[in-house]
């Protein structure tokens, strides 16, 4: 009989990992303390690219490139399977007035990515509502955004087709089941759940969950707040990014503006100060938004990690314990590659990319 894997955490990383493991023929039990996909996976903007990809390490770049190329097919597959459209919306992205534009263009040439310098007039022609005063632009075609909550819902629905997968929501993990040095399951609010392997994919909460084992995982919550406007469907044809803030168009005319970076522990309370700052950024990017009220304002907790390099693989000294966590600002961006790589390693397949940079060994 195939191995049983207990996956802790049903955000996009946990959902997609469970799917990949089930596709690989393993028996999977997915455990989520609340509802699937309701934490950072719900709260993020959904750009299928790191905000500044040239500023990241080769380790993050390798995961991002594989995932970006995979997302359109994943979106179509989930729509076909479930009837729920994750809305992989390919619109392209303009970066405005970059301080490190030379480095960005060098990175694009090195990695053969379609990022190029364009006349600022082109940006203003493509985005008629763009604020005045921007001097320089670079553009990358093919950059998509995904409707995070719909991606999570479609992933959850897709899991129902697998006879070898169980999902337990409203089930909080409260401890680890041990057999000597081996981790053999989790103690939960609804009883014990055992498996041959246990995979932790609990995002910002991963570090706290590992503390009872004496492990110090440098993954900490980093709060991000966003606001949402409702405009005409054709109001913003492209994504735009300047001074670390971005505007993302959804197909139905919703415009997301983000995001803050705050070290506030596990507090997810939206603040007036952040809304004021985000509204100022919205007005600078798209002045027509200045006279509009946001229709929503929320916060989520990213799993902050050193250099944003996730932990993917087995934990030394704790046989049976695996990690897929610590993706920081790029959980959605890196999810397809991270989860496929994890499934490759766990099932003994040839890995899609070199797993060494992500191994927990030597990093805990």
Curated annotation (Swiss-Prot):
- Please state what the protein is called: Glycine oxidase
- Give a short account of what the protein does: Catalyzes the oxidation of glycine, leading to glyoxyl imine and hydrogen peroxide as primary products; glyoxyl imine is used for the biosynthesis of the thiazole ring of thiamine. Otherwise, glyoxyl imine is spontaneously hydrolyzed in water to produce glyoxylate and ammonia. Can also use sarcosine (N-methylglycine) as substrate.
InterPro entries reported for this sequence: FAD-dep_OxRdtase, FAD/NAD-bd_sf, Gly_oxidase_ThiO
A Gene Ontology cellular-component term: cytoplasm
Q: Assembly state and interactors? A: Monomer.
Q: Does the keyword Flavoprotein apply?
A: yes
Binding sites annotated in the UniProt record for substrate: 302
Q: Which GO terms describe its biological process?
A: thiamine biosynthetic process; thiamine diphosphate biosynthetic process
Q: Which reaction does it catalyse?
A: glycine + O2 + H2O = glyoxylate + H2O2 + NH4(+); sarcosine + O2 + H2O = methylamine + glyoxylate + H2O2
Q: Does this entry carry the keyword Cytoplasm?
A: no
Family statement: Belongs to the DAO family. ThiO subfamily.
- Kindly list the positions annotated as binding FAD: 12-13, 32-33, 40-41, 45-47, 173, 327-333
List the EC numbers from the record. Answer: 1.4.3.19
What are the protein's UniProt keywords? FAD, Flavoprotein, Oxidoreductase, Thiamine biosynthesis
Single GO molecular function? flavin adenine dinucleotide binding
| Pathway listed | Cofactor biosynthesis; thiamine diphosphate biosynthesis
Cite the NCBIfam families for this sequence.
thiamin_ThiO (TIGR02352)
Cofactor(s) annotated in UniProt = FAD
């Amino acid at each position: 009989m195939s191995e049983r894997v207990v996956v802790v955490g049903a955000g996009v990383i946990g959902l997609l990992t469970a799917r990949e493991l089930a596709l690989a023929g393993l028996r999977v039990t997915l455990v989520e303390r609340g509802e699937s996909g309701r934490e950072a996976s719900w709260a993020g903007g959904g750009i299928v690219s790191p905000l500044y990809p040239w500023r990241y390490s080769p380790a993050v770049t390798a995961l991002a490139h594989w995932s970006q190329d995979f997302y359109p097919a994943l979106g179509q597959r989930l729509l076909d399977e479930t009837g729920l459209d994750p809305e992989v919306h390919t619109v392209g992205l303009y970066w405005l007035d970059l301080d490190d534009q030379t480095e960005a263009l060098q990175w694009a040439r090195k990695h053969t990515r379609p990022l190029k310098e364009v006349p600022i007039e082109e940006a203003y022609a493509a985005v008629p509502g763009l604020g005045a005063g921007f001097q320089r632009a670079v553009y990358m075609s093919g950059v998509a955004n995904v409707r995070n909550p719909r991606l999570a819902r479609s992933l959850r629905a897709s899991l129902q087709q697998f006879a070898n997968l169980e999902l337990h929501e409203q089930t909080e993990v409260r401890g680890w089941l041990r057999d000597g040095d081996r981790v053999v399951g989790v103690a939960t609010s609804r009883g014990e759940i055992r498996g041959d392997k246990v995979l932790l994919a609990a995002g910002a909460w991963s570090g706290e969950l590992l503390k009872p084992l004496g492990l110090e995982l440098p993954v900490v919550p980093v709060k991000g707040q966003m606001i949402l406007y409702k405009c005409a469907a054709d109001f913003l044809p492209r994504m735009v990014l300047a001074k670390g803030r971005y505007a993302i168009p959804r197909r139905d005319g919703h415009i997301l503006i983000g995001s803050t970076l705050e070290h506030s522990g596990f507090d997810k309370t939206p603040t007036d100060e952040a809304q004021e700052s985000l509204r100022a950024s919205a007005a600078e990017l798209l002045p027509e938004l200045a006279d509009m009220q946001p229709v929503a304002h929320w916060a989520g907790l990213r799993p902050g990690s050193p250099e944003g390099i996730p932990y993917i693989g087995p934990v030394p000294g704790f046989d049976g314990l695996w990690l897929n966590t610590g993706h920081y600002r790029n959980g959605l961006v890196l999810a397809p590659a991270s989860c496929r790589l994890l499934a490759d390693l766990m099932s003994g397949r040839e890995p899609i990319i070199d797993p060494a940079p992500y191994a927990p060994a030597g990093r805990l």
